[in-house]
């Protein structure tokens, strides 16, 4: 599908391991199945609760349009986006940092950081899997629970 820069399945390995900081937000630590990626993500747990060992599909896209064209830059309440209907939880945010792994052991590791209205995400893994990310790019996060 056009506009998608990342798509993988993740398994929740822990929830709020450092304790719960906010009433309606949980921090989830997840591991990917296909690309050996690590995901740390804050989610509004009142709207979309997850628990340990849940499996989710995570898609990161630059647009919600099926044709891949950029969004208009304004919210259109009449717009229909079939991509949204395929998922249970959707957020809009911005990539604010890309960071190389300086450990020197694996060499090709990269971490992408994004903020979705203050809910943070870190996606870390092989740089080849994060090649479409740029600082200050707008990003849609689409998620749904799945069995795999």
UniProtKB/Swiss-Prot annotation:
DNA-dependent RNA polymerase catalyzes the transcription of DNA into RNA using the four ribonucleoside triphosphates as substrates. Common component of RNA polymerases I, II and III which synthesize ribosomal RNA precursors, mRNA precursors and many functional non-coding RNAs, and small RNAs, such as 5S rRNA and tRNAs, respectively. One of its GO terms (cellular component) is RNA polymerase II, core complex. The keyword Nucleus applies. SUPFAM superfamilies: Nucleic acid-binding proteins (SSF50249). Belongs to the eukaryotic RPB8 RNA polymerase subunit family. The gene is rpb-8. It comes from Caenorhabditis elegans. This is Probable DNA-directed RNA polymerases I, II, and III subunit RPABC3. GO terms for molecular function: DNA binding; DNA-directed RNA polymerase activity. InterPro entries: NA-bd_OB-fold (IPR012340), RPABC3 (IPR005570). It comes from the Eukaryota. It is found in: Nucleus. Signal peptide: none annotated. Component of the RNA polymerase I (Pol I), RNA polymerase II (Pol II) and RNA polymerase III (Pol III) complexes consisting of at least 13, 12 and 17 subunits, respectively. Directly interacts with POLR2A. Transmembrane segments: none annotated.
């Amino acid at each position: 599908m056009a506009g998608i820069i990342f798509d993988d399945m993740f398994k929740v390995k822990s929830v709020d391991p450092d304790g719960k900081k906010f009433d309606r937000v949980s921090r989830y630590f997840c591991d990917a199945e296909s690309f050996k990626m690590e995901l740390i993500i804050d989610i509004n747990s009142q709207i979309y609760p997850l628990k340990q060992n849940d499996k989710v599909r995570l898609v990161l896209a630059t647009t919600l349009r099926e044709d891949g064209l950029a969004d208009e830059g304004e919210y259109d309440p009449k717009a229909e986006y079939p991509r949204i209907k395929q998922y249970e939880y959707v957020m809009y945010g911005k990539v604010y940092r890309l960071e190389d792994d300086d450990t020197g052991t694996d060499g090709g590791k990269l971490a992408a950081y994004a903020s979705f209205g203050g809910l943070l995400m870190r996606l870390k893994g092989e740089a080849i899997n994060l090649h479409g990310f740029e600082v200050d790019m707008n990003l849609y996060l689409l998620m749904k629970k799945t069995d795999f």
